[in-house]
């Protein structure tokens, strides 16, 4: 595609702006780093967790969307860096319309997809809390339905938002949304943000219900304690994860909207303003890195508390001896390898 000389000069000024260059390198590094804790948590923690199948399905889909977003940003930022290194002509810095449209779709799709899942988690957790004593036996139907609905709804919204865009403006960043679609995207971001704020209100109520559930643990039978303890711990994890996600997304939306509409009030140079606006998009990959690390850490604490609760549930008599015996051999197995011994927990 042929571009005007002015478009190529503009592309050169934007591509080699120091702020834009810094955002590219930071985005590449943080996206790369975020993939490892996310995949680690998915494969070695979440997939092996004792969460109910409905909640696990939603969480797996949520973390897969985060991994996909980080991989997308890693690919686009690396491509932008390579183009700035190997380009011999100013016009070579401009991204072709077709790849720009494809990667821009993926960026928006995975960005917004992850913001739908907190609402799904809240719906699932309310159902779990209302049926806590028998939820363990509930069929795994709600989770897949909520995930399928989220994916389909988000796909239709993003597809209709971008389907008529030609992407012929000549941009140097895959994250840049065409002017007409940008207004729709920002409106969509704000709507999602306020929906998530409403979700926070329900999550606070859910947290209060969860505290009441914790009190029930003291006066429940051993069999019921196991079920209630799992609902309590998984709900606690869910609420904190949702709150962190919404805070991060709120910061992202605020930064993007502020620098788009008010950035010129504090940054007069348009090239530097463009660089700052692209830098604000690195908030989400940074969140992905933090949430992957946080989830693994929180899960470790949850496991330790669950082990402690298991021992405390029965600490006297024959069952108490079995619990103590199992705990000792669990520690021994973790140090010296597996031992062929059957320990029954009563």
Swiss-Prot record:
Keywords: Membrane, Transmembrane, Transmembrane helix. GO terms for molecular function: transmembrane signaling receptor activity. InterPro entries: 7TM_GPCR_serpentine_rcpt_Srb. The chain crosses the membrane at residues 26-46, 57-77, 102-122, 139-159, 186-206, 239-259, 278-298. GO terms for biological process: sensory perception of chemical stimulus. Its main location: membrane. It is found in: Membrane. It comes from the Eukaryota. GO terms for cellular component: membrane. It is a multi-pass membrane protein. Belongs to the nematode receptor-like protein srb family. PANTHER family: SERPENTINE RECEPTOR CLASS BETA-1-RELATED-RELATED, SERPENTINE RECEPTOR CLASS BETA-11. This is Serpentine receptor class beta-11. The gene is srb-11.
């Amino acid at each position: 595609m042929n571009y005007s000389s002015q478009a190529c000069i503009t592309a050169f000024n934007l591509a080699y702006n120091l702020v834009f260059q810094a955002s590219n390198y930071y985005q590449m590094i943080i996206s790369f780093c975020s993939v490892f804790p996310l995949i680690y948590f998915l494969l070695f923690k979440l997939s092996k967790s004792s969460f109910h199948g409905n909640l696990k399905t939603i969480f797996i889909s949520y973390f897969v969307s985060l991994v996909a977003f980080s991989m997308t940003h890693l690919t686009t930022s690396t491509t932008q860096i390579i183009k700035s290194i190997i380009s011999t002509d100013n016009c070579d810095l401009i991204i072709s319309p077709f790849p720009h449209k494809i990667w821009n779709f993926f960026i928006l799709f995975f960005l917004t997809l992850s913001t739908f899942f907190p609402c799904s988690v809240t719906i699932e957790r309310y159902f779990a809390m209302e049926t806590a004593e028998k939820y363990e036996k509930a069929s795994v139907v709600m989770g897949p339905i909520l995930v399928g609905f989220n994916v389909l709804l988000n796909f239709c919204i993003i597809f209709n938002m971008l389907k008529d865009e030609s992407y012929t403006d000549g941009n140097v960043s895959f994250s840049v949304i065409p002017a007409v679609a940008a207004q729709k995207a920002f409106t969509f971001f704000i709507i999602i943000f306020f929906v998530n704020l409403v979700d926070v209100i329900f999550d606070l109520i859910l947290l209060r219900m969860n505290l009441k559930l914790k009190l029930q643990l003291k006066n429940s039978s051993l069999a019921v304690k196991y079920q209630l303890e799992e609902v309590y711990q998984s709900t606690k994890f869910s609420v904190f994860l949702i709150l962190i996600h919404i805070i991060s997304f709120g910061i992202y939306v605020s930064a993007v909207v502020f620098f788009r509409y008010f950035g010129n009030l504090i940054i007069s140079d348009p090239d530097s303003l463009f660089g700052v606006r692209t830098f604000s998009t690195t908030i989400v990959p940074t969140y992905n890195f933090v949430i992957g690390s946080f989830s693994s850490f929180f899960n470790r604490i949850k496991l330790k508390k669950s082990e402690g609760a298991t021992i405390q549930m029965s600490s006297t008599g024959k069952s108490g001896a079995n619990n103590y015996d199992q705990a000792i051999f669990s520690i021994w197995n973790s140090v010296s390898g597996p031992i062929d011994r059957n320990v029954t927990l009563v």
